[in-house]
């Protein structure tokens, strides 16, 4: 990714910036394609490709496209995760309505499960890093396969106000760590311990299916969608599962984009913030769905719980699992330079940010109690010799930490083509004790919100 950024900066210097008076207009088809050269502490290096395909027609809707197709095919070297994704989005396919649909398949033979209720689940770095000296132990490991198909539609109520409805189908297959070459002890995992404690029920331990229905309202005054300069984007809706384990979630999202009138050649800087809340109001979410963050319009391939580039940056993936979550994201967006190259319009921007959140409704706290331990962790066999973790008492859960504020800060850099295909690289650090994923690096596409 560094090589990509350096090459882009050199090209920007080699080509003169386009004139201030030149009007940016794209017509016809535009293609964005990049290798998925990313890295994360959870999954390792990612190999594959991703991209977007845009159709701008005669250019009258630019910078918003008439049609957008997104796709990804990738594999992660550390977790052996495989991801396949295909999505379509358009406000113009059916006059007066917006259509959003996608199909996603993910195979995670070494998925990390960190426990419930975020700060209450003690993330023991001795266990995590002792995989170097005791390679048969991966305490936080399990496997999961996910197949998802979704379709959402929006229609006009009044100016800037739309109704929205959708359907999401999920099929989950869960189990012990998979793969023929997996060296880990499948009996010594948090996934197995939670089953013994009753925090994961027998009916859901191997996965299940869900059919979610969404319905609500969307208020949108943004000047553009991919990287708004000004406007408000708010959503209020209900999300409910009608199969197996029924539940209803209430979801509220408010995003505000503010143009800062400091005129620089590349464009005015902007300040953006998001306030979000989701909580289960009726029923209980099954284990295989608890990490999900339901959205009306998917901006990224995966939208899951606290601990990702979609919610609070700086945490491990899906580090905070709860029935109710509230969070805020704030960031400054500053364009450094813009230029024209190969008949495409580019800009480079930076975005320092601050994220924070809290648990508003714990998940199965009554089952786990005030504290939970795993006595098998105090002494366990390494690959060759018995290994004792110095000072470890086997505590895996402490509910006195549930209400701790979760907060992080960091910065990112963006490279945008035609204002829509945006490559993003971000670094963040979480300052809540026991939750920091060091290093946390997120490389993908689009602004977070």
Residues of each region from the PLM?
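Membrane-embedded beta-strand positions of outer-membrane beta-barrel proteins
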Residues: 33-35, 49, 69-73, 99-103, ...
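Predominantly the C-terminal beta-signal and adjacent terminal strand-loop region
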Residues: 275-277, 414-449
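Gram-negative/organellar outer-membrane beta-barrel architecture
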Residues: 21-31, 39-205, 310, 435-448
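Transmembrane beta-strand segments that form the barrel wall of outer-membrane beta-barrel proteins
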Residues: 30-39, 64-77, 231-242, 313-318, ...
């Amino acid at each position: 990714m560094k090589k990509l950024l350096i090459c882009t900066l050199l090209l920007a210097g080699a080509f003169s910036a386009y004139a201030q008076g030149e009007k940016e207009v794209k017509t016809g088809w535009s293609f964005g394609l990049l290798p998925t050269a990313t890295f994360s502490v959870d999954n390792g290096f990612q190999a594959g490709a991703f991209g977007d395909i845009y159709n701008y027609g005669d250019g009258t809707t630019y910078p918003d496209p008439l049609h957008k197709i997104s796709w990804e095919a990738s594999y992660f070297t550390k977790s052996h995760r495989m991801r396949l994704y295909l999505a379509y989005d358009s406000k113009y396919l059916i006059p007066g309505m917006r259509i959003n649909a996608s199909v996603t398949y993910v195979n995670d033979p070494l998925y990390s499960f960190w426990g419930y209720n975020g700060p209450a689940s003690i993330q023991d770095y001795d266990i995590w890093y002792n995989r170097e000296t005791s390679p048969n132990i991966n305490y936080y490991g399990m496997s999961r396969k996910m197949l998802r198909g979704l379709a959402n539609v929006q229609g006009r109520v009044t100016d800037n106000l739309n109704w929205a409805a959708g359907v999401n189908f999920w099929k989950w297959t869960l189990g012990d760590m998979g793969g023929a070459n997996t060296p880990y002890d499948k009996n010594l995992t948090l996934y197995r311990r939670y089953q013994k404690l009753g925090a994961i029920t027998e009916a859901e331990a191997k996965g299940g299916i869900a059919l979610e229905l969404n319905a609500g309202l969307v208020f949108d005054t943004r000047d553009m969608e991919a990287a708004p300069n000004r406007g408000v984007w708010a959503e209020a809706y209900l999300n409910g599962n009608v199969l197996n384990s029924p539940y209803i979630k209430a979801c509220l999202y408010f995003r505000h984009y503010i143009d800062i009138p400091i005129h620089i050649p590349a464009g005015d800087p902007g300040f953006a913030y998001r306030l979000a809340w989701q909580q289960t109001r009726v029923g209980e979410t099954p284990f295989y769905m608890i990490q999900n963050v339901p959205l009306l319009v998917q901006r990224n391939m995966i939208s899951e719980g606290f601990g990702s580039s979609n919610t609070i940056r700086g945490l491990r993936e899906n580090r905070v699992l709860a029935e109710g979550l509230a969070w805020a994201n704030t960031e400054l967006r500053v364009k450094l330079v813009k230029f024209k190259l190969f008949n495409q319009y580019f800009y480079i921007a930076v975005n320092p940010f601050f994220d924070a959140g809290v648990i508003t409704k714990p998940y199965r706290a009554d089952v786990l109690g005030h504290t939970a331990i795993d006595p098998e962790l105090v002494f366990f066999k390494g690959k060759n010799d018995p290994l004792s973790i110095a000072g470890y008492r086997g505590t895996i859960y402490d509910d006195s930490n549930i209400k701790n504020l979760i907060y992080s800060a960091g910065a990112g850099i963006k490279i945008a083509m035609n204002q829509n295909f945006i490559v993003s690289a971000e670094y963040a650090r979480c300052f809540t004790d026991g939750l920091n994923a060091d290093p946390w690096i997120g490389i993908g596409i689009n602004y977070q919100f």
